[in-house]
């Protein structure tokens, strides 16, 4: 019925593509004109396009700025509205420039890298520019397609980001497109973990693989510089973490990202759907890890799993469970049965009358639940691997290891205890965001993938992104065979082995896709027993990933890969000549770095000839054959695996092998129904495969159920995270306003005055009191401004006989005087130090700048400390909110209500922290600055006493000599006395963080020549402060 309806209404996707034909015709008509231009004229075209863009947007932009002139742009809602209107203005101008810009990039690409964009690639570029998702089959050139909208949107001068799934793909993609952009006068940046670079054709990276021109021209630069490039390539993790780090900095110049203007997400389904449930978290150490993790890991061993489900007990089909615990495979949760609970209570030696879930044992249940999950739900070589004594999570969708990622809420510690590796201390969340909310902050977002249409509903509902299927340049001729279905995994793996051998014997390359490390090693061991050479690519070995995948199309090659989704490297029939050059050079007795130009040319020609000969042989044999060892939870990941074969019109085929013992079938399949079908169709031979449309539908139905379940979970995550996301936007917008503000004094004074007004009402104008409590009011006033205690007698006289409102006015006046006096005193002290050649705070060069810096630090410190506490509290609220369902309340509604109440408390806590700390911390700074003065005077006196220059003045002392491989800095503890004092020696490694808290390494900051005196002053301040804290 639906197919008939589709024919009647027409294919909406075809209509979208057809609408782009006039634009495509315009682009093609410009091709002869572009070909006639010289290289220099092509480059000049970029500047011309930028000028035209500025002219096209000028009037509307000025009108927009005028309308928002009186608005608070630091308000996240106002800024969003502004950016929406600005996007309409800019997109209208870019749409007008699109044909010329695309034609320009096409011509530059043809000249620089020898690749001309096909018409279908132009259509893909238009889709991406419009902020949609382009579904493009494997081998259709997504990297090249992205160059078109990246260039066009970079014309606006606000940056354009290309986001990929791993560092290698980002580096290769940027290095391949970099020459195109460079020829057109645009810069390309690259960000990775602890590394950032700019594409520079005149720079050669000595550490890069020299035979790959895409990797050698990355010149290291600051992260800020990489983001300021016209286009920036990087991974989703790096962009997200940089955003979080930017919202934790203490100085504006420490921010690295600019506005989130335009982004293209490669493998968009992987990043925005598969990883949507995994939040990015920056955490810091909390308390030391508890011994209870090891204790409970030992206690939970040896429990028996129940084969009876709660449904069977609830429906009366079974009397009781037959084990100690049962597992809900769908939600991956584990629950103790009554017998299991009794076992655990005995093992814990709980007193009679006590049980695990008594309030006093609440903490123990946390360890118990995590230990049970670690022991029985999370499996080694499936959910994680152990590498170098560490538990490393394996991405369930891509099969990649995720170093640095840790499960939260103690689960990671429980797994570490299970594996008998070091149990690391637990963490507290400092900042967090989900990919869903990070990418929704971009003004415009596009995406590319080979498989998106099955998730079109989710892309539309959560990200407001439409999926458009881009036609292939050549027709796909791959043959997708029906699934082979078996009752047992043993029979299935035997069939997989037979099929691999059959394909190998006729010279066809085979790619075996598995869903876990465990299953990939099962296949690998079967092949070893048969003596068949093969490559194994899983979470344990991905260093040579790109090379292995690139050569997977060679004659008779056998490659086993865990979840091919997102691998990002094309499998070329016959192999990739680039990867064979080193082999031929080795045969010539040389290497890539030592080869002569003649040897290099000979190796390249030989590799190309070998590949071409193999390509013909492989194509005649039938091309690449794909084997899936089981169906994935999502149909699109199956499609991604299939899509590795049959690229750009090449021959190929695919088949999936399934058993009823596969995880998908046990968790989501209706096993009883499928078993009955199989019994009717089989003759009892387990080794005989079954092919049936009914069975195929049953399996597809299981996949549809799991897709629906996972969509609901992700929607659930985003609904909850949206609450915190709005609050995060408010907090981060406030931080940005503070970082960019020159003077926060008025705002701080306003907070102080508000607090005084509260206490006026509480102590002086409170009808519940018998009489005004002036003493109580003064206590609060002195706790806010301790400096006023010195004026106690004078203030008592001024307040005597006054009404509440008059006292409030006098108190406000007195506080403002104290504030101004404090600013003047700190300014005088800071000026004195500057005159003596010491700058206690790097980058703060004047007395006014110092006081403004101090005010900002007070406000940022209050926000950050309270926000960290709030994140912990709101996470605990979220974990426990499910209990309200018992009281028949909607958990989401209850969570929103409580979270908004907590957020109001957070704002009040921030204000209180600023109000009650500001004057106290300022007084401490006065003490610290005076201490630095005394330290300097003591060192000067010491130098004179020790026979220094007779003409010694109050200039800064000579710098201490630097040691080899590090530095020793001596800080006197003389505290103003001229006599020799005990010295404190602080050793700082060249690569250690600089003690000035700039975030830079020591060697690049105060380890530079001429910075010694300044460093001594900083260390003196820190030392004095540490002493002061100790005394408190």
Curated annotation (Swiss-Prot):
Leading EC class: translocase
Catalytic activity: ATP + H2O + cellular proteinSide 1 = ADP + phosphate + cellular proteinSide 2
Record's subcellular location: Cell membrane; Cytoplasm
GO terms, molecular function: ATP binding; metal ion binding; protein-exporting ATPase activity
Keywords on record: ATP-binding, Cell membrane, Cytoplasm, Membrane, Metal-binding, Nucleotide-binding, Protein transport, Translocase, Translocation, Transport, Zinc
GO process terms (BP): intracellular protein transmembrane transport; protein import; protein targeting; protein transport by the Sec complex
Annotated residues for binding of ATP: 121, 139-143, 570
Region called Disordered, residue ranges: 945-975
Cited CDD domains: DEXDc_SecA, SF2_C_secA
One cellular component (GO) term of this entry: cell envelope Sec protein transport complex
Main location, first listed in the record: membrane
Cell membrane keyword on record: yes
Family of the protein in this entry: Belongs to the SecA family.
PANTHER family documented for this protein: CHLOROPLAST PROTEIN-TRANSPORTING ATPASE, SECA INNER MEMBRANE COMPONENT OF SEC PROTEIN SECRETION SYSTEM
Description of how the protein assembles with itself and partners: Monomer and homodimer. Part of the essential Sec protein translocation apparatus which comprises SecA, SecYEG and auxiliary proteins SecDF. Other proteins may also be involved.
Protein name in UniProt: Protein translocase subunit SecA
Source organism: Herpetosiphon aurantiacus (strain ATCC 23779 / DSM 785 / 114-95)
């Amino acid at each position: 019925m639906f197919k008939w309806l589709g024919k009647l209404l027409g294919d909406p996707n075809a209509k979208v593509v057809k609408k782009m034909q006039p634009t495509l015709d315009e682009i093609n008509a410009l091709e002869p004109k572009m070909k006639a231009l010289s290289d220099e004229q092509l480059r000049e075209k970029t500047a011309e396009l930028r000028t035209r863009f500025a002219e096209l947007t000028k009037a509307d932009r000025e009108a927009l700025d005028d309308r928002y002139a009186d608005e608070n742009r630091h308000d996240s809602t106002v800024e969003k509205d502004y950016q929406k209107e600005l996007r309409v203005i800019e997109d209208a101008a870019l749409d007008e420039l699109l044909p010329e810009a695309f034609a320009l990039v096409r011509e530059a690409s043809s000249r620089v890298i020898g690749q001309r964009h096909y018409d279908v690639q132009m259509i893909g570029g238009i889709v991406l520019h419009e902020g949609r998702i382009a579904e493009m089959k494997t081998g259709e050139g997504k990297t090249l397609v992205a160059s078109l909208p990246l260039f066009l949107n970079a014309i606006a001068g606000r940056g354009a980001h290309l986001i990929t799934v791993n560092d290698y793909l980002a580096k290769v993609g940027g290095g391949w497109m970099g020459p195109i952009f460079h020829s057109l006068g645009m810069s390309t940046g690259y960000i990775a973990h602890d590394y950032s670079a700019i594409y520079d054709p005149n720079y050669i990276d000595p550490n890069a693989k020299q035979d790959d021109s895409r990797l050698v021209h990355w010149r290291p630069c600051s992260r800020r510089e990489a983001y300021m490039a016209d286009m920036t390539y990087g991974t989703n993790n790096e962009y997200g973490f940089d955003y979080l780090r930017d919202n934790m900095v203490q100085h504006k110049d420490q921010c690295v990202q600019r506005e989130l203007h335009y982004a293209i997400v490669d493998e968009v389904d992987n990043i925005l759907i598969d990883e949507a449930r995994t939040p990015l978290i920056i955490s810091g150490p909390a308390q030391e890890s508890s011994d209870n993790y090891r204790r409970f890991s030992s206690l939970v061993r040896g429990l028996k799993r129940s084969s009876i489900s709660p449904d069977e007990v609830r429906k009366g089909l079974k009397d009781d469970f037959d084990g100690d615990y049962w597992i809900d495979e769908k939600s991956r949760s584990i629950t103790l049965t009554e017998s299991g609970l009794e076992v655990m209570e005995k093992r814990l030696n709980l007193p009679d009358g006590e049980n695990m879930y008594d309030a006093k044992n609440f903490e123990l249940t946390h360890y118990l639940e995590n230990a049970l999950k670690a022991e029985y739900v999370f499996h080694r070589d499936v959910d994680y691997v152990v590498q170098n004594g560490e538990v490393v999570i394996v991405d369930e969708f891509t099969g990649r290891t995720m170093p640095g990622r840790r499960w939260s809420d103690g689960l990671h510690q429980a797994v570490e205890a299970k594996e008998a590796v070091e149990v690391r201390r637990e963490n507290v969340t400092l900042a967090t965001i989900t990919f869903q909310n990070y990418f929704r902050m971009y003004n415009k977002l596009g995406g590319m993938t080979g498989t998106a249409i099955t998730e079109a509903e989710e892309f539309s509902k959560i990200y407001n992104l439409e999926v458009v299927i881009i036609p292939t340049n050549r027709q796909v001729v791959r043959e997708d065979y029906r699934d082979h279905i078996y009752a047992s995994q043993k029979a299935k793996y035997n069939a997989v082995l037979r099929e691999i051998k059959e394909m190998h014997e006729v010279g066809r390359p085979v790619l075996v896709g598995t869903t876990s490390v465990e299953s990939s090693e099962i296949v690998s061991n079967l092949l070893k027993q048969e003596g068949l050479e093969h490559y194994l690519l899983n979470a344990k070995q991905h260093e040579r990933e790109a090379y292995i995948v690139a050569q997977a199309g060679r004659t008779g090659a056998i490659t086993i890969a865990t979840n091919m989704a997102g691998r990002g490297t094309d499998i070329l029939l016959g192999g990739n000549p680039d990867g064979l050059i080193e082999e031929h050079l080795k045969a010539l007795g040389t290497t890539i770095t030592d080869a002569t130009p003649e040897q290099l040319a000979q190796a390249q020609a030989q590799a190309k000839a070998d590949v071409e000969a193999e390509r013909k042989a492989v194509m005649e044999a039938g091309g690449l054959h794909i084997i899936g060892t089981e169906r994935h939870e999502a149909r699109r990941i199956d499609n991604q695996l299939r899509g590795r074969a049959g690229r750009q019109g090449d021959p190929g085929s695919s088949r999936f092998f399934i058993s009823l013992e596969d995880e998908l079938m046990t968790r989501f399949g209706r096993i009883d129904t499928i078993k009955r079908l199989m019994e009717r169709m089989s003759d009892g031979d387990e080794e005989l495969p079954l092919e049936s449309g009914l069975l195929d539908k049953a399996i597809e139905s299981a996949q549809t159920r799991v897709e629906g379940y996972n969509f609901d979970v992700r929607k659930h995550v985003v609904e909850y995270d949206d609450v915190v996301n709005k609050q995060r936007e408010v907090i981060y917008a406030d931080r940005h306003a503070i970082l960019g503000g020159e003077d926060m004094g008025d705002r701080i004074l306003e907070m102080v005055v508000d607090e005084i007004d509260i206490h006026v009402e509480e102590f002086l104008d409170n009808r519940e009191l018998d009489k005004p409590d002036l003493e109580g009011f003064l206590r609060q006033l002195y706790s806010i401004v301790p400096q006023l205690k010195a004026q106690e007698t004078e203030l008592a006289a001024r307040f005597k006989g006054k009404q509440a409102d008059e006292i409030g006015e006098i108190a406000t006046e007195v506080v403002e005087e104290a504030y101004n006096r404090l600013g003047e005193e700190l300014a005088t002290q800071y000026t004195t130090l500057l005159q003596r050649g010491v700058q206690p705070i790097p980058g703060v060069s004047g007395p006014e700048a110092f006081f403004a810096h101090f005010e900002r630090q007070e406000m940022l410190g209050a926000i950050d400390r309270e926000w960290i506490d709030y994140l912990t509290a709101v996470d605990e609220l979220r974990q426990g909110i499910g209990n309200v369902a018992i009281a028949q309340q909607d958990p989401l509604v209850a969570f929103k209500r409580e979270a908004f109440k907590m957020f109001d408390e957070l704002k009040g806590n921030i204000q209180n922290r600023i109000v009650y700390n500001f004057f106290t911390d300022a007084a401490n700074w006065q003490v610290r600055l005076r201490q630095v003065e005394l330290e300097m005077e003591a060192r000067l006196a010491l130098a004179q006493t020790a026979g220094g220059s007779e003409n010694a003045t109050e200039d800064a002392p000579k710098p201490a000599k630097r040691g080899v491989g590090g530095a020793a800095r001596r800080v006197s503890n003389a505290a103003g006395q001229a006599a020799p004092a005990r010295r404190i020696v602080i050793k700082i490694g060249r690569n250690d963080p600089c003690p000035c808290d700039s975030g830079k390494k020591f060697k690049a900051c105060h380890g530079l020549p001429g910075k010694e005196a300044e460093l001594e002053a900083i260390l003196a301040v820190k030392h004095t402060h540490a002493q002061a804290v100790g005394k408190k």
